[in-house]
Amino acid sequence: MKHAVLRAAALALVLFAGQAGATNWLKVAEKAAQGLEDRSSTVQHSGTIEYAFSPHEGAEKLVLKVIGSARSEIRMMTYSLTSAPVVEALIAARRRGVDVAIVSDYKNNVAEDKSGKARAVLSALVNAGCRVRTISIYPIHHDKVIVADRETVETGSFNYSDAAANKNSENVMVVWRNTELAKGYLEHWNSRFSRGDDYQTRY
């Protein structure tokens, strides 16, 4: 919230620039506003770190372990979501009472999904009771993240796809039971989910 307010204040400087030099003021204000978002965060180490690779080196198995560990909540960010084992695990989590919410890239999963597989997956998740949104405000929504129970974070290069599990060189890292790290990732997830649109199932 603080950064949003400061960004608005920086852009408001343009209103006082007058006609002369307004373009330069706009560039300065936009640069200042952009700088407010260019930040990193640090958290204290806690919990256990587990990692795996692919193809066929345990990456997908570790993702499934995280989903299977969830007792109350899963928050997920995806670019690709076509892995049958991952989708089945998410649906199983929902059926055992876990609140599952997902934000996924619109272009990859809807607009350019020529096979219809990605749309079928999103529909299956919605029909199972998961909350699914797609986001299109970025050229690519490339996050690959799962936050389980507000304490465990899974991330890495691993797309939730068959290719990532069986063909591509990928990595997965899980930080178990680190609530501060999970809090930061949840803030990022919320910022994307809030800008997404509910996926309307066609099945």
Question: Which functions belong to the PLM regions below?
Answer:
Residues A17-Q19:
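N-terminal signal peptide c-region/cleavage motif recognized by signal peptidases
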Residues M1-A9:
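Bacterial N-terminal signal peptides that target proteins for export
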Residues S80-A84, Y106-V110, Y138-H141, T152-V153, ...:
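Solvent-exposed loop/turn segments at secondary-structure junctions
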Residues W25-H56:
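N-terminal low-complexity, Pro/Thr/Ser-rich intrinsically disordered segments
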Residues E50-P55, T78-Y79, C130-V132:
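Short, flexible loop segments at the rims of nucleotide/cofactor-binding pockets, characterized by
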Residues K65-N127:
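Primarily the HKD phosphodiesterase
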Residues W25-V28, S40, A148, T152-Y203:
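Signature of lipid phosphatidyltransferase scaffolds
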Residues T48-S72:
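Mature N-terminal segment immediately following signal peptide/propeptide cleavage
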